[in-house]
Amino acid sequence: MIRRPPRSTQSRSSAASDVYKRQQIMAWFMDEYGMINGHTPGIVTGKPLELGGSLGRNAATGRGTAIIARETADLLNMDLNGARIVIQGFGNVGSFAGNFLNEMGSKIIAVSNVNGGLIDPDGLDIPSLIEHNEKNKTIKGFSQGKAISNDEILNVECDFLIPAALGGVIHKMNVDKLNCKVIIEAANGPVTPPADDILFKKGIHVVPDILTNAGGVTVSYFEWVQNLQQFQWTEDEVNAKLESKMVAAFKEVGNMMTSKDTSMRMAAFAVAIDRVANSFELRGV
């Protein structure tokens, strides 16, 4: 007997926004699917608010990154207040993460985007830089800081390095030049496996992407739930639920890391596999 896979519906699956797939594209996606299948706003997330999007979704990945950085500092007995932070990638994720970390008292000493970067050892004025970037679509021409390239920014001495752009930027050819204590993976796969092994041996703590940037997909889930309920939560409710989820996930991964004496990446994988294995066992599969 041939078993046909079920047709994709908003009760079974939901697409989320990512790099180059912003609100307008998600709105088109929802509209096209809806013309064929009827009103199904939950089929995609990251939509405009007017079309069933969630409050807090735009900032979610950056907010989650800042929460994870804060929890990591606590775990490693580091002081986030005054900590020197470098952010490669000052788009949606990096700019929000930088703003939240700035509000937490951290010193953002260098940032970059596709056009290059800026560095100021005394700390950049992040709110003004965000305003400049939104107005000019570039961080070039900002009144503060010295120009620095995307490659050079990875080598800046700092406490926390946050790669928030594209994958594979830290690899075996440049990993020995890094001068940070902790790497917070806000992008997807910014550290290659060979580089990851080297960092672990050198004692540089890497917080994996599947934990760090989970804030975005978490609030996408919240958006999907709101669509199914046909009820919108307040931004404070969304942010509080996100905080709770991120902190709980970090603690679970941290406990696994400590108990197994392994890297945080391996601990995150172990937690995920344990959950799947337990669900299969309970179902008798």
Annotate each PLM feature.
Residues 116-206, 211:
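Rossmann-like adenosine-cofactor binding region
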Residues 53-59, 63-154:
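Glycine-rich phosphate/diphosphate-binding loop of Rossmann-like nucleotide-binding domains
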Residues 1-16, 20:
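Single conserved hydrophobic/aromatic residue that forms the stacking wall/gate
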Residues 14-81:
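Glycine/serine-rich phosphate-binding loop and adjoining beta1-alpha1 elements at the start
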Residues 14-17, 40, 77-84, 257-269, ...:
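Flexible, glycine/charged-enriched surface loops at secondary-structure junctions
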Residues 14-17, 38-44, 87, 110-113, ...:
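General beta-strand structural signal in soluble alpha/beta enzymes
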Residues 72, 177-285:
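Adenosine-phosphate binding glycine-rich loop
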Residues 21-22, 113-118, 212-215, 273-275:
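Glycine-rich beta-alpha junction loops
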